Amino acid sequence: MKTGLIVFAREPLPGAVKTRLAASIGDQAAADQYETMLEDVLKAVRQLDDVAPVVYWACEEGSLPRLSEKYRCRSRRQSWGDLGQRMRVAFEEMFADGTDVCCIIGSDAPDLPLLYIQEAYRLLGALQTDAVFGPSRDGGYYLLGLRQVWP
């Protein structure tokens, strides 16, 4: 079974990330904090067996080679649209590349236990669950896992 992991990220530019945090600590400090979280997330997910994470960047097209090299990761550019549309396109691309099950996480949850991601893959694979959500306290979710994209 080919497992995919999408990490949604933004280029850590001052004024472009963690804007609510930046209001109290400044644009550069917020960008530095975001970059630290991103690096921690990437370091963690590289420990997953048989999973090659792909970072989907919200960035200019010309930034992809530099970001791929700097963060040593497979990189793609996020599509346009709202978050749901961008996630859908990312899943579609991963499944088109032969991925059997795929999860998506954000780049600002460095304390997300790898066990949670592994459990999502177990549910999607062995138990053939169609979709898995990792609910967060704020009413959103920290992980979405799918076996396929539905129309």
Residue locations for each model-derived region?
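Short beta-strand/loop segment that forms part of the nucleotide-sugar
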Residues: D50-C59
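Conserved donor-nucleotide/metal-binding helix-loop-beta segment in metal-dependent transferases, i.e.
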Residues: P110-G140
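N-terminal nucleotide-binding beta1-loop-alpha1 segment
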Residues: M1-L21
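A short, N-terminal amphipathic alpha-helix
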Residues: D32-V51
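Short, high-confidence coil segments that cap the C-terminus of an alpha-helix
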Residues: D50, T99-D100, Q128-T129
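Short acidic/His/Gly/Ser-rich catalytic and metal-binding motifs that mark active-site loops
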Residues: L13-T19, S63-R66, Y141-L143
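Short phosphate-binding loop-to-helix
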Residues: S68-V101
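Short aromatic-hydrophobic micro-motifs that form the base-stacking/packing surface
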Residues: C103-I105
